[in-house]
Curated annotation (Swiss-Prot):
Annotated S-S bridges: none
Protein name, entry field: DNA mismatch repair protein MutL
Biased composition (Gly residues): 385-396
Domain of life: Bacteria
CDD domains (alphabetical): HATPase_MutL-MLH-PMS-like (cd16926), MutL_Trans_MutL (cd03482)
Gene that encodes the chain: mutL
Organism annotation: Pseudomonas aeruginosa (strain ATCC 15692 / DSM 22644 / CIP 104116 / JCM 14847 / LMG 12228 / 1C / PRS 101 / PAO1)
Keyword Ribonucleoprotein belongs to the record: no
Amino acid sequence: MSEAPRIQLLSPRLANQIAAGEVVERPASVAKELLENSLDAGSRRIDVEVEQGGIKLLRVRDDGRGIPADDLPLALARHATSKIRELEDLERVMSLGFRGEALASISSVARLTMTSRTADAGEAWQVETEGRDMQPRVQPAAHPVGTSVEVRDLFFNTPARRKFLRAEKTEFDHLQEVIKRLALARFDVAFHLRHNGKTIFALHEARDELARARRVGAVCGQAFLEQALPIEVERNGLHLWGWVGLPTFSRSQPDLQYFYVNGRMVRDKLVAHAVRQAYRDVLYNGRHPTFVLFFEVDPAVVDVNVHPTKHEVRFRDSRMVHDFLYGTLHRALGEVRPDDQLAPPGATSLTEPRPTGAAAGEFGPQGEMRLAESVLESPAARVGWSGGSSASGGSSGYSAYTRPEAPPSLAEAGGAYKAYFAPLPAGEAPAALPESAQDIPPLGYALAQLKGIYILAENAHGLVLVDMHAAHERITYERLKVAMASEGLRGQPLLVPESIAVSEREADCAEEHSSWFQRLGFELQRLGPESLAIRQIPALLKQAEATQLVRDVIADLLEYGTSDRIQAHLNELLGTMACHGAVRANRRLTLPEMNALLRDMEITERSGQCNHGRPTWTQLGLDELDKLFLRGR
């Protein structure tokens, strides 16, 4: 029998190369670490030069504070940093880097040259090291105030790692994405990128709102900026601001999602869950929302030392953060109206800050959003479009549409589907649109109906096309939600209680949240350490659905501290009712009926999408129509 291998210390070089496996995955990983060091050094301009996707050369140059000559060799040592001293510093760290591992890991798998000069030094100093030679060589050099780090021949001494690198273009795309993320995190810093001698982009400092919006457009594309809703909300020490894309501007991949916590880019499952919930019934199946959001919170309540790449964070009160993010985004999306979507591109974000519905959310003593009030707020409580002179008996000849003062009951809403258009106020569209654009409602006035499916309307911008069924489906759905919220969820006791086996941890969770389940129509009773009984379920649910739903909800509560599955399931049922009850294709409408539907869309939450996330209307501007007919050439 062979002797068991003995335990021994690894050499510093091998230990650093193993550590590099966590920190240095590809050239983009190197760029991230070097750029974060430059930002932590107070740089105002960072130049990045790349050759062969960063595999042959990656040079980062900044104008930061620089590193004293005596500290240069120490900067390449493991666990050497200027950013923290005590454990208490780690609990409130605001710098992007703090572990002191990056340069040591990089220098162990590449040829590294670092040149730096401080403001009070007469000359610059340079240190060189290679993967096989961990003894750095320091010598004088010429360099302005700041630091340059040059990384050549990445993985030259670890062929096994090098062969896993992708093609040059792929590696450069990853590297460019890292720079974009940091450019969005720090608007006050200029970024310049060159690849193989060609300038890719030059982003100047952005210190005012206009310049910040321009940078967002440069990084994310002008189309995103034109289809984004600016938001800013602060509540109970939590501050969220940035841009959220309209549901109609979604992507097939989650590749336009930037979320920052105290200036640090993160990809956190709690954040992702809150965002998914907010977009739940306005996003088409399989599509992903777009956003650039900045979340600021006391650093003492967030732990950034969770993952080697620092992409994950842990919040001390995760439920409060989740509810704040969800409530803010849900309200902001719910406040979007056709006139918001018809505003000139970027006009809202480039002028004065706009008030959003998210700012009106109310939080209880524990910081929880009262979702029943904020999410299911009645559209009937809003003041509809007045239409200027036309609403007050002016020249348009069209009387403004008036919603009922109180929302209908669930039974009334359910039974009134086919009679929806009967009580609508009569009135004809004006023969000609009012001269003033302010007197024209956002969706304009109906002109005709096409194939019994689409409504054609004229507004101040051109032609509006409305999917009649999809629009009515959303209006009916929102009315049903309002009715359910006002009446409450009626519970239905089970003749024979349903017993379900769970773990002790799950049973504890259900018992802890029993009052929460009760508000949603469930009554749960603990029978034993690992057993629950369902005694009552919401009247709209079937018993078989309820059993699995309780299991899923408990799993969510354990994972996120909250769950929207019950509400989502009920909303799905209401959505089905609304879909079946909405006006069908080939239903001929009169002009007054079409105009009444347009007015209703203008005051209904999320009227831009049906319950399944499909758009309900689109705008064809005069410029687009002119292009179709080659006018103006």
